């Protein structure tokens, strides 16, 4: 039975999709219409009790949360495609460290920018300019740390592309695109080089080409 990914067109599920494509794993996608509330229906809540995307079904096995799905796929299919977890326990420690940084430090201010610049009007709440300013300042500070780190390391976890890098792709793509703050990446030499590298990977290009919302 082919692995199924629910909600492919949204940003967080793309973490799972790019990992699956990198590893060469066959899968199918099932759309979830958040605007119609499909994510709050009993059938979907049976897969993801918190009502967010993605949810993944792999035979009889169910898993949700995009970074957990990334880890699951990279571990289960470790023998095929690029090793996204590292070759040593020390490598793995760095991958996990930067995955945590992405989830707890990088993502929160970027999510605020995403919601209040891209989706406030669609979701029916007023855009909070004060929060936008504070979030941009917070993200700038985080990116300054990335700049220093990436001046000494090609990728976040070392000299190899890992889940830590891939986890940044979906929302950073928003940052340099529809959010309109590409300068936050481009003005930092080493962050910019890293972004150009990871966003040029064929797996990410395929993810964007196949699973973005129609214009």
UniProtKB/Swiss-Prot annotation:
According to the UniProt record, list the residues that bear Methionine sulfoxide. Answer: 35, 118, 123, 184
Chain positions recorded as glutathione binding sites: 11-12, 39-40, 52-53, 65-66
**The reaction(s) this protein catalyses:** RX + glutathione = an S-substituted glutathione + a halide anion + H(+)
What triggers expression? By zinc in roots and benoxacor.
Recite the UniProt keywords alphabetically: Cytoplasm, Detoxification, Oxidation, Oxidoreductase, Peroxidase, Phosphoprotein, Stress response, Transferase
State whether keyword Nucleotidyltransferase applies.
Answer: no
Can you supply a Gene Ontology BP term from the record?
A: defense response
Ranges where the GST N-terminal domain occurs: 2-81
Q: Which SUPFAM superfamilies match?
A: GST C-terminal domain-like (SSF47616), Thioredoxin-like (SSF52833)
State the EC number(s): 2.5.1.18
| GO (cellular component) term, any one | plasma membrane
Family according to the record: Belongs to the GST superfamily. Phi family.
Where, per the database record, does this protein carry Phosphoserine?
12
State its role.
In vitro, possesses glutathione S-transferase activity toward 1-chloro-2,4-dinitrobenzene (CDNB) and benzyl isothiocyanate (BITC), and glutathione peroxidase activity toward cumene hydroperoxide and linoleic acid-13-hydroperoxide. May be involved in the conjugation of reduced glutathione to a wide number of exogenous and endogenous hydrophobic electrophiles and have a detoxification role against certain herbicides.
Q: Name the Pfam families on file.
A: GST_C, GST_N
Q: How is it modified after translation?
A: Oxidated at Met-35, Met-118, Met-123 and Met-184 in oxidative stress conditions (e.g. hydrogen peroxide H(2)O(2)).
Q: Which protein are we looking at?
A: Glutathione S-transferase F9
Chief place of localization: cytoplasm
- In its UniProt entry, the species of origin is given as Arabidopsis thaliana
Q: What controls its activity?
A: Redox-regulated enzyme; in oxidative stress conditions methionine oxidation ensure a thermodynamic and structural compensatory mechanism to guarantee H(2)O(2) peroxidase activity despite transferase activity inhibition.
Q: Where in the cell is it found?
A: Cytoplasm, Cytosol
A single GO molecular-function term is: copper ion binding
